[in-house]
């Protein structure tokens, strides 16, 4: 074990100290209710924290509700919402159970690829440039972001990060 001793020793990333170098990478699982954290999701992360992960990353935390559609249609099922303060209590629950077992928590903030399924709007993938394929579906028409939309997305990421911080993540 001496060969791998560094794996189990505490270390710092910036001003955050992790108890070891084991990181649970983000994954999206079917344990949310319309983007809200459920008891099952809290239990899922608690079990990983009990396993002594130094850092647990919550997968697919959407920074915006792109179109406010009902019912929700999305390409990443099981994603958590992070675009409104109403989601903070759920993230607090995850942070509390993970911290109780000594694990730090991070969130994978991401922009959702959600669209209207009504047929009223064309299915467009948003991209930094219309000439660079970057959407989730190859061959799907892409639309370049405007400068105003880019500024809005940057703002949404900042707001979501603040919500995570407020939740103890």
Model-derived regions: residue spans:
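Flavin-dependent oxidoreductase catalytic cores
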Residues: 1-169
